């Protein structure tokens, strides 16, 4: 990624060993782990030092390996439903441009369900999360992706590590969305945090 440089990186696994490392078709580093006797628990630890640049959530100028139009396809978790159409219609009111619409769409999605830890699983669809009116970060992300794609905006699921500014030690994995805008690039949105 052009806004970060990896200075040091190390990955370890409690119940196995890393046997192969390669770059996938999207340009991501993949590490394969071999586990001889799986005991039901697996702890993977990655640590490193990165040098980053603040780009205000906009990723521009990357040499993409995948055309953004590929991120218009529905998945089982992001198939649009009637509630996605309602979210879209609400977000379409009074927008001057596509960026303003994307921000409004993010806000409407942010207000569409309540964040309730443990209320869903990794297989919960955007439709199901909207139906029960609660979910976690991945559900907010799936809903925003569904709504963006419904409006012909390429959108992709991003996950990473959320660094809490309170230094409480409660840092965790997190999911958010990037929406592609022509002539600008990918813009990050975090609907579960209304950002």
Question: Where are the model-predicted features located?
Answer:
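Intrinsically disordered, low-complexity N-terminal segments that are enriched in acidic
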Residues: 1-55
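A broad, low-specificity signal for short, low-complexity segments enriched in glycine/proline
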Residues: 2-11, 116-118, 136-141, 149, ...
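Generic structural "secondary-structure junction" signal
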Residues: 13-15, 28, 35-37, 52, ...
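Residue-level signal for pocket-adjacent positions within structured domains
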Residues: 21, 25-30, 67, 125, ...
């Amino acid at each position: 990624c052009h806004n970060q440089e990896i200075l040091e990186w190390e990955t370890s696994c409690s119940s196995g060993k890393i046997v192969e490392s390669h770059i996938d078709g999207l340009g991501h580093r993949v590490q394969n782990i071999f586990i001889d006797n799986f005991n039901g628990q697996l702890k993977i630890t990655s640590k490193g030092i990165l040098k980053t640049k603040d780009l205000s959530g906009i990723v521009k100028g990357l040499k993409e390996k995948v055309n953004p139009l590929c991120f218009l396809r529905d998945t089982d978790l992001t198939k649009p439903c009637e509630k996605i159409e309602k979210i879209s219609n609400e977000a379409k009111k009074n927008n001057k441009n596509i960026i303003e619409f994307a921000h409004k769409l993010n806000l409407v999605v942010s207000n569409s369900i309540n964040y309730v830890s443990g209320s869903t699983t990794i297989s919960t669809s955007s439709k199901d999360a909207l139906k029960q009116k609660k979910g976690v970060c991945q559900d907010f992300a799936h809903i925003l992706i569904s709504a963006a794609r419904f409006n012909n905006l390429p959108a992709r699921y991003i996950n990473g590590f959320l660094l809490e500014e309170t230094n409480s030690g409660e840092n965790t994995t997190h999911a958010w969305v990037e929406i592609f805008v022509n002539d600008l690039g990918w813009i990050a949105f975090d609907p579960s945090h209304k950002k």
